[in-house]
């Protein structure tokens, strides 16, 4: 059994991770955290999430969770700032880490990479297997279609999402620029007013926010007389949690290093 701690265990992603882990047969949840001052601190995690008792008491810090139980891996879907702090704790304790948070600054990404020198870390803006297949296919389409097609990325999420564009949209933009031999300067994140004709090298990344949209990403390849649309729509959070649990199985017991879902899924690197 892989002994697992879930940060933010009573939140939307945390409770989904707990539910799927309980049904997994090979993952044992031994700890969980909630923010300091949360009403769930001190409660049984299963009771707090209406799953029934699971004999895991919610605590208010990762340090306390790791003090209370030996763990093989921590799964973290909190925030970029907290994930960096949690990575430092895992590095000090020798515990593997799976990070699904988004909104990382370059400095935060560098701090995460520093912690990965001590422990294995899987970090990805989207843990869904389907999304990661879309990312891979988008890069391949861009390489095959080449400069004859204009490329745009559109993402939509619920009104409560704090960062924009989404981490997945930024990852799509990253692989598209690599595949097309372009740079960050070719990305545009907003258009307004008399902007003139579209530059040939431009890649647009646009954002929608509203309602309860779990997550939707579309890459448009716009050519003369034809258009290709590559879309992933999430209707619940189960696929994100399932991907994170898959990553937890993969990373537990590995040597230190920073990995992403392409490594977990065994994708051959193309760039």
UniProtKB/Swiss-Prot annotation:
Annotated Gene Ontology cellular components are: cytosol
Instruction: Give the CDD domains listed for this entry.
Output: DHDPR_N
What catalytic reaction does the record list? (S)-2,3,4,5-tetrahydrodipicolinate + NAD(+) + H2O = (2S,4S)-4-hydroxy-2,3,4,5-tetrahydrodipicolinate + NADH + H(+); (S)-2,3,4,5-tetrahydrodipicolinate + NADP(+) + H2O = (2S,4S)-4-hydroxy-2,3,4,5-tetrahydrodipicolinate + NADPH + H(+)
Its localization reads: Cytoplasm
Pfam families assigned: DapB_C (PF05173), DapB_N (PF01113)
Annotated coiled-coil positions are none
- Which SUPFAM superfamilies does the annotation name? Glyceraldehyde-3-phosphate dehydrogenase-like, C-terminal domain, NAD(P)-binding Rossmann-fold domains
Q: Which GO terms describe its biological process?
A: diaminopimelate biosynthetic process; lysine biosynthetic process via diaminopimelate
Question: In which residues is (S)-2,3,4,5-tetrahydrodipicolinate bound?
Answer: 158, 167-168
Q: Which GO terms describe its molecular function?
A: 4-hydroxy-tetrahydrodipicolinate reductase; NAD binding; NADP binding; oxidoreductase activity, acting on CH or CH2 groups, NAD or NADP as acceptor
**Which Gene3D superfamilies would you find in this protein's record?**
Dihydrodipicolinate Reductase, domain 2 (3.30.360.10), NAD(P)-binding Rossmann-like Domain (3.40.50.720)
The residues listed in the UniProt record as binding NAD(+), with positions renumbered to this chain, are: 8-13, 100-102, 124-127
Q: Where is the active site?
A: 157, 161
Where is this chain primarily localised? cytoplasm
Q: In which pathway does it act?
A: Amino-acid biosynthesis; L-lysine biosynthesis via DAP pathway; (S)-tetrahydrodipicolinate from L-aspartate: step 4/4
Cite the binding residues for NADP(+): 35
> What InterPro entries would the database entry show?
DapB_C, DapB_N, DapB_N_CS, DHDPR_bac, NAD(P)-bd_dom_sf
Enzyme Commission code: 1.17.1.8
Highest taxon listed in the record's lineage: Bacteria
Q: Which UniProt keywords apply?
A: Amino-acid biosynthesis, Cytoplasm, Diaminopimelate biosynthesis, Lysine biosynthesis, NAD, NADP, Oxidoreductase
User: Would you identify the family this protein belongs to, as annotated?
Assistant: Belongs to the DapB family.
- PANTHER family xref list: 4-HYDROXY-TETRAHYDRODIPICOLINATE REDUCTASE 1, CHLOROPLASTIC-RELATED, DIHYDRODIPICOLINATE REDUCTASE
Annotated function: Catalyzes the conversion of 4-hydroxy-tetrahydrodipicolinate (HTPA) to tetrahydrodipicolinate.
User: Could you tell me what this protein is called?
Assistant: 4-hydroxy-tetrahydrodipicolinate reductase
Q: Which organism is it from?
A: Myxococcus xanthus (strain DK1622)
């Amino acid at each position: 059994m892989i002994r697992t701690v879930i940060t933010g265990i009573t939140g939307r992603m945390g409770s989904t991770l707990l539910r799927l882990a309980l049904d997994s047969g090979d993952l044992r949840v031994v700890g969980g955290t909630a923010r300091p001052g949360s009403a769930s601190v001190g409660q049984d995690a299963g009771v707090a999430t209406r799953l029934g008792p699971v004999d895991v008491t919610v605590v208010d810090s990762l340090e306390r969770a790791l003090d209370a139980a030996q763990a093989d891996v921590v799964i973290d879907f909190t925030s970029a700032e907290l994930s960096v702090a949690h990575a430092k704790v895992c590095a000090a304790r020798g515990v593997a880490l799976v990070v699904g948070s988004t909104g990382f600054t370059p400095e935060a990404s560098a701090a995460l990479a520093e912690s990965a020198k001590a422990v294995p870390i899987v970090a990805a803006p989207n843990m869904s297997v389907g999304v990661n297949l879309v990312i891979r296919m988008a890069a391949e389409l861009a390489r095959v279609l080449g400069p004859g097609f204009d490329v745009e990325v559109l993402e939509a999420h619920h009104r409560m999402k704090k960062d924009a564009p989404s981490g997945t949209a930024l990852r799509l933009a990253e692989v598209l620029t690599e595949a097309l031999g372009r740079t960050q300067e070719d990305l545009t994140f907003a258009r307004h007013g008399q902007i003139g004709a579209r530059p040939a090298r431009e890649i647009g990344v646009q954002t929608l926010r509203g309602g309860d949209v779990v997550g939707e990403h579309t890459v448009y390849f716009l050519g003369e007389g034809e258009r290709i649309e590559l879309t992933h729509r999430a209707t619940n959070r189960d696929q994100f949690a399932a991907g994170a649990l898959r990553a937890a199985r993969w990373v537990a017991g590995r040597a230190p290093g920073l990995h992403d879902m392409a490594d977990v899924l065994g994708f051959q690197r193309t760039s």
